[in-house]
Amino acid sequence: MNIILPGDKDYESRPSVQRKSLRINLNENIYGTFVEIGAGQEVARNFYRVGAASGTIAKSMSAYDKSFSDSIYGKEDNGRYVTQNRLDKMLDHEMDLLEKRISRDKNPDKFFFVYANTVATIDFAKKFKGHGWMGIKFQTNPNDEYSEIKLHLRFRQNEAKLQQESLGIMGVNLIYGAFYKHNEPLKLMKYLSDHLDDQSIEIDTINFSGPLFKGVDNRLISLELVRLGMTDAVIFDENGTNVLPAQVLYKKNILTLRGSYRPITKVNEEMFKKSLEAFLKEKKVKEENTIVVFEITLSNLRSTGDIDDSDY
């Protein structure tokens, strides 16, 4: 029985990394694979260390060598390994293997998951701090289709060891959140930083998909990233899918139009047309390599008081 003293205030208790890992390990129905490339096996290590992992972890693997990794997941057209496309291949390939090797007839109550990350930690010269993709493909009922959470992160720490440890903690937070906070995606996202210093990892892109997240608007998720200070800016496309800023803007001619756009008016449309016409007249600007970004700042959203999600 808990003791409550006069003057105690209600507060939200967040489990430690160890308790999160152990709770998952002790659930005899949660079963899956860990595949980690680029920063050790820090996420899986947390589950091994607390014990009772044999009924949870089907396999943990790190295909570090590029040739070996290519033989498993296939070559990337652009030759890059820390990409969302690589993450997608890892999640899909490992889930296919899990379903082929573990009989549903013998394990009717198991719900499967695959956790994957592909990262590059800080380089030897400490000029590039590193970044990565991590994600989880999972179900909370054996008969359900799989849901997914995928995110892009940037390391802010200056030591590879610290980056590895932070990645391990965030990975546990993601897996725990997927199983136990999927009904509250905004809280799930907030809890990704549990037990991490504010300056350790930046999340600049995250997307929720699948049956567990049917009602989730990923644009609002991206708004929350900025509102919580987890990143400075986010980009989403015309379909409402969050996209990686560096991937979309790299080597592009960028025309930015700032406004509140609530609603989009004739004036906005005319400004867009005239601005684009003028921009394309610049000598080094080619239309096929030009991208137009409509920018909305938090100041715009707060212009009439608190932020109204419906404006976004």
List each language-model region with its residue ranges.
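Nucleotidyltransferase catalytic core that binds NTPs
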Residues: 2-312
